[in-house]
């Protein structure tokens, strides 16, 4: 422990706790504070509580965080940090622990002396968790004692009291989310596990243990998972890229501080063609990028360009190919993780996940520029491999432009015209319209007849959709099935510069783009192919909240005069339990299994899958970009075994047809 840390440890007391506002507002308008009141908001409570412990870890005082999902769906988070101060708060005249737990925005993270940087996107602190819980209990291990206070809906039940002695330090929080506020109070293990894994990678050396005490249907308990990454981002980039083939061996890594900004980067080049950069600020995934990402891209391109200009062999290759290398070319087949720590981050953008601090751009440029120049000089073999891939990317980019232009020449209408197979809607206001991408001609026929022509368009997809995970950029524009989708929805490329790979959605023709496929394994594979196309080539559509998946029913259950469509095996069982159980005349039960969309007549398809009043739509979102990247590369990659395991685990219908 450094002298500075020792002084901080001794001085972390009530005077470091800053107070900003009260809790009533949180219960009145919870979505303002945690994003929403559905599954996402529910899991945000865990993140907000764990962030307190991560702040202790980033300050150098905590090495182990234990997260437990209890049998009653409450959550316990315990760390071995210094423990929240319990002495009296000067202004509030009550225990600092009570202030932290009951006043919004109160905490060490708002006092620069306690934490130089602090995690948490909303930064509302653990008091917000308290306000949105029916019950919460805080225990602090500090000064040789165990201090405790309990709360109901954010209000203390008694003053902070000593309930025992201890020789350890740290904080333990347990909370029960309020079912009158959240639409669900059931925690999903996988969502919590993904975030804990991410935090362990972003904070090298810390150990996070995740335990689920809820037994499964057979009464078995899941084994606790321990997340620990000694090498941090180096392990993270390997994890994200584990289904791809690296062309440079070990990741290129840097960990430094420039202009007061701690910067960490790990990157790999692989044999694929997509660019996957995941950026973080204070452990927050900046999905929309920002100044740290801009600085990284500029420095990387500059270093590689300088190297290829100064190397005779590479320079001759570029001259022979008659190409001009563009910035995008330097990032084809690149996977990178960038993590910066910023004392006062300014977030911008649609989802407040874009870093706006201008000083970070220069700091990252310096750090990455120096590290890349050194690496390229010391690793000439790898440097040549990367630069040769860049030259190939530039060649493919020019081929893509030609392919795109030839498609647009064939269709002289604006934007390349509309495909002949598109059955468009009569309404021309995009915000009121939606398009269904439907698997196969027969289902497309039913969908065309069953739709509301005023606002619903249908594009039948014939033949196999191209797996874009494994192809060069220009091949996408040569595939008719892909171009039909791009032209139908109104996405344009080359708007921000003729060779730009950014998809422009300013002239998107529909507010909702709905993938509609059969409820079987083949259907889920087609879903995945289309989602991969959007994720890799048109992520702006997903980020704008425009991509959805339709959920056709698996069964129609009829018993006497009762009839219901069932979308899951559980719903079918619930129907049987409700109407048939105990009835000796069970022969009256009729179950129709829909294997494909084409088996439904147009009225049934409208009633179950297309009518906005009844249908079940799943919105495609990218909550965790690094996790999504790893999943898509696994699903669409060459290795069959992990793909089969994933589909069997995640497609509830996979075992029905097996």
Give short role names for the model-derived ranges:
Residues 1-16, 23, 47, 55-57, ...:
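GHKL-family ATPase ATP-binding module
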Residues 89-90, 97:
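Short adenine-binding "F-helix/F-box" segment of the Bergerat
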Residues 83-88:
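A short glycine-centered beta->alpha linker in the GHKL/HATPase_c
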């Amino acid at each position: 422990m450094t002298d500075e840390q020792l002084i901080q440890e001794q001085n972390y007391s009530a005077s470091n706790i800053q107070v900003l506002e009260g809790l009533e507002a949180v219960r009145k308008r919870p979505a303002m504070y945690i994003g929403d009141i559905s599954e996402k908001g529910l899991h945000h409570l865990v993140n907000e509580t764990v962030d307190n412990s991560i702040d202790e870890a980033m300050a150098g005082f905590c090495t182990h965080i234990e997260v437990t999902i209890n049998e009653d769906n409450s959550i316990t988070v315990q760390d071995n940090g210094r423990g929240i101060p319990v002495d009296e708060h000067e202004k509030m005249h009550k225990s600092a622990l009570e202030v932290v737990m009951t006043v919004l925005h109160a905490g060490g993270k708002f006092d620069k002396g306690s934490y130089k940087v602090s995690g948490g996107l909303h930064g509302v602190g653990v008091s917000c968790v308290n306000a949105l819980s029916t019950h919460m209990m805080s225990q602090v291990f500090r000064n040789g004692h165990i201090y405790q206070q309990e709360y109901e809906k954010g209000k203390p039940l008694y003053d902070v009291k000593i309930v025992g002695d201890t020789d350890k330090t740290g904080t333990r929080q347990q909370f029960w989310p309020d079912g009158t506020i959240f639409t669900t109070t059931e925690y999903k293990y996988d969502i919590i596990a993904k975030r804990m894994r991410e935090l362990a990678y972003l904070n090298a050396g810390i150990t996070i243990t995740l335990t689920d005490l809820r037994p499964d249907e057979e009464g078995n308990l899941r084994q606790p998972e321990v997340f620990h990454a000694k090498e941090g981002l180096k392990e993270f980039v390997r994890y994200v890229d584990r289904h791809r083939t690296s062309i440079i061996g070990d990741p290129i890594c840097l960990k430094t501080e420039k202009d007061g900004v701690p910067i960490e980067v790990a990157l790999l080049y692989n044999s694929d063609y997509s660019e996957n950069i995941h950026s973080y600020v204070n452990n927050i995934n900046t999905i929309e990028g920002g100044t740290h990402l801009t600085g990284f891209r500029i420095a990387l391109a500059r270093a590689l360009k300088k190297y290829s200009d100064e190397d005779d062999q590479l320079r001759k290759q570029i001259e022979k190919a008659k190409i001009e290398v563009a910035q995008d070319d330097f990032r084809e087949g690149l996977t990178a993780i960038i993590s910066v720590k910023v004392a006062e981050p300014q977030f911008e953008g649609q989802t407040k996940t874009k870093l706006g601090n201008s000083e970070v751009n220069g700091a990252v440029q310096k750090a990455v520029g120096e590290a890349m120049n050194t690496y390229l000089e010391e690793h000439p073999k790898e440097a040549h491999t990367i630069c040769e891939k860049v030259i190939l990317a530039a060649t493919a980019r020019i081929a893509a432009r030609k392919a795109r232009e030839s498609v647009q020449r064939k269709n002289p209408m604006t934007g390349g015209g509309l495909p002949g197979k598109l059955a468009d809607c009569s309404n021309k206001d995009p915000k009121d319209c939606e398009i269904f991408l439907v698997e196969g001609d027969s289902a497309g026929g039913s969908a065309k007849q069953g739709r509301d022509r005023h606002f619903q368009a249908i594009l039948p997809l014939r033949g196999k959709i191209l797996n874009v995970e494994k192809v060069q950029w220009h091949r996408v524009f040569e595939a008719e099935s892909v171009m039909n989708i791009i032209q139908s929805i109104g996405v344009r490329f080359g708007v921000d510069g003729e060779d730009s790979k950014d998809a422009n959605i300013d002239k998107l023709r529909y507010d909702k783009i709905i993938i509609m496929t059969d409820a079987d394994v083949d259907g889920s594979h087609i879903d995945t192919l289309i989602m991969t196309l959007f994720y890799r080539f048109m992520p702006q559509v997903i980020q704008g909240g425009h991509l959805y998946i339709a959920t056709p029913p698996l069964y129609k259950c009829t018993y006497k005069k009762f009839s219901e469509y069932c979308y899951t095996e559980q719903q079918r069982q619930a129907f049987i339990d409700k109407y048939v159980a105990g009835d000796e005349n069970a022969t009256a039960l009729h179950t129709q299994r829909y294997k494909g969309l084409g088996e439904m007549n147009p009225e049934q398809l409208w009633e179950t899958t297309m009518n906005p009043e009844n249908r079940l739509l799943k919105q495609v979102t990218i909550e965790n970009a690094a996790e999504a990247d790893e999943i898509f590369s696994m699903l669409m990659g060459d290795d069959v075994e992990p793909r089969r395991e994933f589909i069997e685990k995640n497609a509830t219908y996979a075992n029905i047809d097996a």
